[in-house]
Amino acid sequence: MRSALRVLPKRRLSPRLPQPRFYATLNPNTPPPTAAYQVFDEPSKDLQRSRAIIRLRELQAAKANAEPAQGESQISAEDGLRVVDYLREEVSERLAERIGDLRVPPSSIMDLSAHAGQLTQILQDVLADEVPGQGQNEGQGRQEALYRDQDSCFISPPERIQASPSDLLAHPEIEPLKEQVEAVVSSGGLQWVGDIVGGLTQVRHLLKPDGVFVGAVFGGDTLFEMRTSLQLAEQEIRGGIANRVSPMINPTDAPSLMNRAGFTSVTVDVEDLTINYPSMWELMADLRDMGESNAILGRRATIGRDVLVAASSIYQELFGNEDGTVPATFSIIFLIGWKPGPNQPKPSKRGSGQSALQDVL
C-alpha cells in the first residue's frame, strides 16, 4: 500500500534582510535652545487686566449715577475702583514691613509689577518723601492699572521710587536703568513670569553691587480649595481634568531659583493668608475683577456651568465654615536676595579657624 504523503521539492530560501531601524540622535555639541519655555498667554493676561479696569470703571459709574438707598452714601470714584484691592494691599503691607527692616534704607527703589501702586503708596510712609516720580510702560492692561487713580492723590511716588507695571524686563525702556538702583521690589507679579530664573536674573542686572531684591509671589497651596473642588467636579462630570488654576512656585524651590539667578544671602519665608467668601462664585468674581484669572497656554476656553455648580457644592461640603462661608487660602512666598558686591560678608577660608567647635560646646 503506497503512502499518501507527497514529497515537495526543496525550495531555495532567500536570505531575510534585517528591517531598518530609525533612531533620534542629538549631537552633544549642539547648543541648547535659547528660547524660554512659555507657560502663560501674555496677550490674554493683558486683556484680562484691561477688562478688569473697564469693568470696575463701569461699576463705579453705575453706582455713582444710582440713587443711594436710605442710610447709604454715594460711592466715590476712588472706592469704586478699589473694590478688589484688599488682597494686593495686604500683601504690599507685609512686603513693606520687610523693606522697612533693611538696616540701610535704599536711596533708589524700582517697583516692578506695580499694579495700581499699592506698594508704592505704602512705601511713601516708610520713606517719608512725597516728590512725584515716573513710571515705565509695558502692556496696555498694566499701564491702565498703574495710572488707574492718576486723578487722585493715590499715585504720587517719591522720586527714589520708580513704579513699573512690567512683569518681564526684556524691554528697551528699562535698559538704561541697569546697575542704577539699590533695591528692586515686586508685590505679586512674579507668578506670571514663565521663566522665573531668567526674570530674576534681569532683576539682578538692574541692581547696583550689594543691591537687594525684595519680592512677594503667590505659590505653594494658593487656592488649593478651589483647585481640589474643580478637579473633583470635572472628573465626575467630564471624566477628566484640565488646568483651571495657574501653576504656582513651590516654596522649597524658591531658594534654588534665587541662587541660580545669582543672588546671595537668600532668605525665603512663607505666610498663609485665609479670606472667607460667601461662596465660590464671589471668589471667582473677585479674581476676575483683579485681572488674576487663569492665563495658562493651551487652557480650555470654557468650563461649563454644570461643572461650576458641582464644584461650588463640593467646595462648600469639603471646606465650608460653620457660618456658611468658604475659605480661600493664599500662600505668599517672600523672597530677599542680594546682588554680590565687595561689601558683603563672606565665609572664611576652610581651616582658618583659631578654636575648635567642641571647645565652645
Kindly give the residue locations of the regions a language model identified.
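N-terminal chloroplast transit peptides
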Residues: 1-15
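Class I SAM-dependent methyltransferase Rossmann-like catalytic core
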Residues: 24-107
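Hydrophobic beta-strand segment of the Class I
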Residues: 183-189
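A short His-aromatic
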Residues: 191-193
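A short glycine-rich, Lys/Arg-flanked "PGG" loop and its adjoining helix->strand segment in the class I
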Residues: 197-212, 227
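Conserved catalytic/acceptor-binding region of the Class I
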Residues: 214-282, 290-303
